[in-house]
Amino acid sequence: MPVAQGDLDATSNAEFYNPHGVLGGHLGIGKHADTATIRVLRPLAKSVTILTQDGEYPMTHEYNGVFVVTVPASGTKKQPTIPDYRVRTEWESGAVLIEDDPYRYMPTVGDMDTYLFGEGRHEKLWETLGAHVLRYDDPMGGADGTPGEQVVGTAFSVWAPNAHAVRVVGNFNAWDGRRHAMRELGSSGVWEIFIPGIGAGETYKFQILNANYTWEMKADPMERQHEVPPSTASIVTESTYKWNDDAWMQHRRTTNPHDGPVSIYEVHAGSWKQGLTYRDLAKQLVDYVKQEGFTHVEFMPLAQHPFSGSWGYQVTGYYAVDSRLGSPDDFRYLVDQFHQAGIGVIMDWVPAHFPKDAFALGRFDGTPLYEDPDPLRGEHPEWGTYVFNFGRREVRNFLVANALFWLEDLHVDALRVDAVSSMLYLDYSREPGHWRPNIYGGRENLEAIDFLKEATATAYKNNPGVMVIAEESTAWPGITAPTSAGGIGFGMKWNMGWMHDTLEYLHEEPINRKWHHNEITFSMVYAYSEHYVLPISHDEVVYGKGSLYGKMPGDDWQKLAGVRSMFAYQWAHPGKKLSFMGNELAQWGEWDHDASIDWDCLNWQEHRQVQTMVADLNAFYKAHPALWSQDFDPAGFQWLTSDDADHNTLSFLRIGTKGETLAVVVNFSGEAWSDYQVALPTGGKWTEVFTTDDAKYGGSDIHNGTFEAVEGEYHSRPFSAKITVPALGVVFLKPED
C-alpha cells in the first residue's frame, strides 16, 4: 500500500497529524486484499522484524527510519483483517526489544465523546481525556509477547486544536517523542494514542508542535497525578481504592445539608502539622476534628499547584491532588476516613484563574486556549495570572467536569468557590481604560455568569446532598438564588460583611464599643438576603492582621474571654459556621504557611480550656436545632434587645423548625452585669444551658442555673427575668418544655 511522499516525510519526523494513517497495519485492496502492509518508525534501528502467529517477516527500510513489510492478512477471504503482531527491533548496540505497536489500535476516544466535549456537555470528561490504563485480551499475549497475558497499556488524549502535531514523551521513550506521535481525531482538536506496555507510575508529558511551529513540553491538563514540585511531569495513575463510605454517600444523597448543622474547620493541610501525609492526616486530623465536634472540614486547595506560597490558589493540575502529601488513592483514603467518622469534606475550588507556568495550561497549543484571548479580560493584573475563557464551550466543560470530578470521583461533599467576585466583574481590580465592557456596555462578565450558573446547577442536579459555596465579597444580588429564579445558583455564600464588622467591633476596647454598637447588630439587617456562611477564615489571621487572640484587646484573660465569646456569638448568629485552624486554640501568632499552628500554646491550661469550650460548643450546637434548622428563614431569629449599647450587650431568640427556642445573651463589655433584665417570650422556668464563663473554660464561673420568668411587659415581650451576665461572656437560656 503506497503512501504519499509528503505524508511519509512528515510521519518520519513525527510531525504528521494522522500517523496512524501511515504507520501500523493497512489492508491491501483489489488483488492484494489478502495482504496487510505494516509500517513502523524505528530511527537508527539495525533491523526490524514483524512477528505474527504465522511467522516472522523481516522489514525493509523504506524512508528516514520508516520500515515496511507486507504480510498475509488474517480473517476470511470475504472479511480479511490485520493480523495480531509484535515488533522485534535490533539496535546497533546489539540490544533486541520485542514490543507491541501503538499504531495497530483503534481510537480510545469515541465520536460521542468528542461531540459532547465540543458541545461543552461531557460531564465525565476525566474518564475520557488524559491518561487511562487499559487492558486488552490478545492471542499473542502481553505487549512484549509473553503468552497468556493481557496487553496492558495507557491511552493518552489531549485537546490542542491549534497544534500541528502532538507527541507523548516519557522515560519509556527516553523523552524522544518521535516514537509516539498522536493522531488528531477529526476536527475535534483532540489528539490520541494508545501505547502498549505503559502502566501506572510512568511519568509523561505532551510534546506539542504549536501554532507557531515551536515544540513545547506541556503537562497533561487532565492529569490525575503529578510529580512532586519542582518537577513538572504528569504521572499515569490507576486507582485501586475500595471505598468504605457507602452509608455516608447514601445519607448524602437523601439529606439536604443546607437545613442541617454546619460548623466548618478550615485547614491548610501542609501546615496544620507540618510533614504529615494524606495517610497521616487520615488518622491525626480526622481524630482531632471529631474530638472538636466540627461537622465538616474545609481544605484550602489541594489541587496540584507548583508554588506552595500560593496556598494552593494557583492551580496547574485541576484533576490531580497535591502530590506533596501523597497519591490520589491516599487522598481518597483521607476522605473515606472523614466520612466514616461522620465528618463532611469541603474543598476550595479555583475556577477563576490559573498561573502562567510554562509547563501548564497557558498558551497551551501556542494560542490562548484555556485563557481569554482578549488581554483586557484574559489576564488578572493583581495576581499575575491568566483568566479562563468562560465563553468557550470546551473550557467551560473542562471546569464544570472538574467540579463533578471532585464531588463524584473523589467523594468530596462540597466546593467552596474562590474569588467569585473577580469572575462576576470585568473591571475587577482593573484601572479605568484597562477593561473591556460586555456587549451591552456593562461591567458584568456575562460569560462567567453563565459558567457559574451551569456549574452550580449541574453540581446540584447530578449530586443531591452536596453544597456549593461562594466566596463573594460584593452585594451582587441573587448569588444563592436558584438559577430557575435568575440567581447564580450557589447554596451558600460567605458573609464577608458580618466578618468585617464583627472583627472591627471586637478589636475595639470594651469601653469604646458602645460607640460602635451598630457594627455588631447591622448584620441582621441583611441576614436573609442570601444564604450565608459566617467565616473567620485564613484571610483574617495572616499578612499582619494577627491571630484571633491577638485581635482582642486587654490582658491575657480578657483576650481569651474575647475569643470564647466570639465563638459563641458566631455559633448563635444565623448562618453556617466556619473557623480557621488555630482559632480554637486561641493561638498567639498569626498563621504562617511555612510552620505548624501554635500547638505549644496547649502547654498552657487557659488555651486547653478554650479548645475544650469549642468542642463543647459544637456538641451543644449540633444538639439544638434552634441554632441551625432555620438559618435561612427569618422565622428562626427574633431580637429581644438590640439597642443596649451602654452595656455592650445584645439578646435574641433562635427558633427551630419544630418550635425549640433558645434565648442568647451576649455581653461584649468588660464588666459582669448582675440583675440584668432580659426580655423573654414565655413565662415559667428557664435554665442556663451553656455559658462561655464556666470555670472549665477559663471563665469566672458565673452561673444562673434555673430561674423564673415573671410576667410584665419588657421590651415588647410579656415576660422577663433578671440574670447575671458574665463579662465578655455569652449565655444560652432554654425554657422548660
Curated annotation (Swiss-Prot):
InterPro entries: A-amylase/branching_C (IPR006048), Branching_enzy (IPR037439), GlgB (IPR006407), GlgB_N (IPR054169), GlgB_N_E_set_prok (IPR044143), Glyco_hydro_13_cat_dom (IPR006047), Glyco_hydro_13_N (IPR004193), Glyco_hydro_b (IPR013780)
Cysteines engaged in disulfide bonds, as pairs: none
SMART domains on file: Aamy
Transmembrane segments: none
Keywords: Carbohydrate metabolism, Glycogen biosynthesis, Glycogen metabolism, Glycosyltransferase, Transferase
Annotated metabolic or biological route of this protein: Glycan biosynthesis; glycogen biosynthesis
The reaction(s) this protein catalyses: Transfers a segment of a (1->4)-alpha-D-glucan chain to a primary hydroxy group in a similar glucan chain
Cellular component terms per the entry's GO annotation: cytosol
EC number assigned by the record: 2.4.1.18
Keyword tRNA processing part of the UniProt annotation: no
DNA repair keyword on record: no
Gene3D superfamilies per the UniProt record, alphabetical: Glycosidases, Golgi alpha-mannosidase II, Immunoglobulins
Residues the record marks as active site: D418, E471
GO biological process: glycogen biosynthetic process
GO terms, molecular function: 1,4-alpha-glucan branching enzyme activity; cation binding; hydrolase activity, hydrolyzing O-glycosyl compounds
One Pfam family, short name: CBM_48
SUPFAM superfamilies found in the cross-reference section: (Trans)glycosidases, E set domains, Glycosyl hydrolase domain
Domain of life of the native organism: Bacteria
Function, in words: Catalyzes the formation of the alpha-1,6-glucosidic linkages in glycogen by scission of a 1,4-alpha-linked oligosaccharide from growing alpha-1,4-glucan chains and the subsequent attachment of the oligosaccharide to the alpha-1,6 position.
Family label: Belongs to the glycosyl hydrolase 13 family. GlgB subfamily.
Subunit structure: Monomer.
Name this polypeptide is given: 1,4-alpha-glucan branching enzyme GlgB
Name of encoding gene: glgB
